[in-house]
């Protein structure tokens, strides 16, 4: 009877040990399936690098059609109350990235009228004249790049980029780019920068593979921006 009890105890210990090892292996594999993708923006063209001002740059990743990501990409999360504020005859922030389908507020915090509009393909709209202290709202239904202006103050400009992916990065002031928690797999890398001609509408893109040994985008070269 004692021998049976000892054997039974050993059997349970072995099974528990196997379960623990399997859970550890699954967890390790899960953590190994994502990485942080990094890159750096550099200006090309006639200007010398020492005098070039880095243009606003955004990159994003979309899975290549037919290439499943593991784990699957989560839906992009909307920032709380995304807004493009009009203040001191400028838009704040100058570049705003939102999930497609987001509603963006355009509050006027200047002591005079503004007339915000966009004529490019991302989202066409004209909010008309509206006074200080009031707000207009625009819904960006589909992915796209919208160039925003004011019909009264030509020096005002901004960009709203609506995306269908949570994997994006806005370049820092020194040109650094970083996207965390990128699942291993094949992606299209999309690159938008202020130095690109708006009329071209489409950002640059190329296919990349993200893996444990391939997570650096290297140097992303973009043209200098015209914005002062």
Stretch-by-stretch model annotation:
Residues 11-12, 112:
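A generic signature of intrinsically disordered, low-complexity regions enriched in glycine/proline
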Residues 5, 14-16, 211:
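Intrinsically disordered, low-complexity peptide-like regions
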Residues 30-228:
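Extracytoplasmic copper-binding redox domains, predominantly the cupredoxin/blue-copper superfamily
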Residues 8, 28-31:
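Compositionally biased non-globular segments, especially hydrophobic aliphatic-rich helices
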